[in-house]
Amino acid sequence: MTAAVPTGNTYDKYGSANPVVRRLMTRFERDMAELLETAAPASILDVGCGEGVLTEQWARAIEGPVVGIDLEDPKLQEEWQRRSQPNLVFRTGLGDSLPYGEAGFEAVTAMEVLEHVPDPAAVLGEMSRVASRWLLVSVPREPLWRALNMVRGAYLRDLGNTPGHLNHWSKRGFADLVGRYGEIVELCSPPPWTMALVRV
């Protein structure tokens, strides 16, 4: 990942008061929690953690170490300081050259990250190198994501493409991509996302 890759959320979907967004996020978080429960990891590395919303949730859910990593950004570092937990560490780094040894974490996650990076295969390769058991990844499901943006009048000049989205996958296309890095144990479709739990 490079400095041209955006950090944080373009739209605060986790803090939105919009009832439709809240309903979508409730389903997203429920499916994600079920996949994490299936994986039951003792340690987690969250690649592209952004503000650390999910990273903090995971640190509260497991006793083992949880590390969030993202690009250098003072705004993110302010958020990270607010999310302090005894087993939680945030640090800066690149998804395509993770500063950890092989199989250093039981689970490695990238939630809403791969659509932003110039080389998703390089990031997934690094994630699978560092994971001893699991990858948990999610991306916007296309063309549904862009269509919903258009319906709500967002990003019309870019045909509904959210700023910073460089890559776009259908559910099948995403399964084909992540399936190269292990066995897909579960593939979920909480609208408008695709989410996969992969055994490495």
Task: Enumerate the language-model features and the residues they cover.
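Conserved N-terminal segment of class I S-adenosyl-L-methionine
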Residues: 1-101, 124, 151-182, 186-200
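Conserved acidic residues
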Residues: 42, 106, 133
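A conserved beta-strand element that flanks and buttresses the S-adenosyl-L-methionine
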Residues: 109
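Hydrophobic adenine-recognition pocket in adenosine-nucleotide-binding enzymes
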Residues: 113
